[in-house]
Amino acid sequence: MKKKLKLTSLLGLSLLIMTACATNGVTSDITAESADFWSKLVYFFAEIIRFLSFDISIGVGIILFTVLIRTVLLPVFQVQMVASRKMQEAQPRIKALREQYPGRDMESRTKLEQEMRKVFKEMGVRQSDSLWPILIQMPVILALFQALSRVDFLKTGHFLWINLGSVDTTLVLPILAAVFTFLSTWLSNKALSERNGATTAMMYGIPVLIFIFAVYAPGGVALYWTVSNAYQVLQTYFLNNPFKIIAEREAVVQAQKDLENRKRKAKKKAQKTK
């Protein structure tokens, strides 16, 4: 879990740095005549957004583009959520192993790693599954950033009060992006039977990273991130409802208690008849 936290933080920091670099880097316009592959990809995304705007607003195009991307990537995000849940379910056993092998010597650490790998393999845990959506979205976000900064018909677009090619100085979108990120993380962790410091740090740390990123990004990118995380909240609620998981877990526990009570009563009754 700690490794995942460190890697997620590193990816977030990398994205923030790349955003800053993009802001201060090359700002020449990208057009249909641009020759290099990256510029063609950026312009392709821009054309999709313009098509999806239906001549209403570029903001509408970005919203529909986000929904389209998230729907296409739905299987990948579902794999991430399942992987995260498996990782969380494995934590009590991992904690027990750490208590069983507390030594700092090479032999103890090696044995601990071996036993942890066995647990992960048994429970079908692959840490890389949790990171695929982040890795896949990074080029999409960077291409969208470049499109809003360097494609003329996007960088001059507006949606409500937002100039999509400039930062949202009202901070409404960065705040919304952070709030929806927190809600999606909170929902994902709601059904945890046990929480640790790393889980709590991710729940509060990732929204902060998203907020900082959205503050310095063009309004269109902040809009993308807001809609993307709102989509994630709905996906979690309808496909991985934590309240349903908790209710099912409590029902299993209650059924076990009822079974034990019936066995106890049957045993007492049998003893009385002797």
UniProtKB/Swiss-Prot annotation:
Which BP terms does GO give this entry?
A: protein insertion into membrane; protein transport
Lipidated residues (N-palmitoyl cysteine): 21
Q: Which InterPro entries match?
A: YidC/ALB3/OXA1/COX18, YidC/Oxa/ALB_C, YidC/YidC1/YidC2_Firmicutes, YidC_ALB_C
Is the ATP-binding keyword given for this protein? no
> Which topology term describes how it sits in the membrane?
Multi-pass membrane protein
What transmembrane ranges does the database entry give?
Answer: 56-76, 128-148, 167-187, 205-225
The record's subcellular location field reads: Cell membrane
Instruction: Name any one Pfam family assigned in the record.
Output: 60KD_IMP
Q: Where mainly found?
A: membrane
Function of the molecule: Required for the insertion and/or proper folding and/or complex formation of integral membrane proteins into the membrane. Involved in integration of membrane proteins that insert both dependently and independently of the Sec translocase complex, as well as at least some lipoproteins.
Q: Which family does it belong to?
A: Belongs to the OXA1/ALB3/YidC family. Type 2 subfamily.
Q: What is this protein called?
A: Membrane protein insertase YidC 2
- State the organism's lineage: Bacteria, Bacillati, Bacillota, Bacilli, Lactobacillales
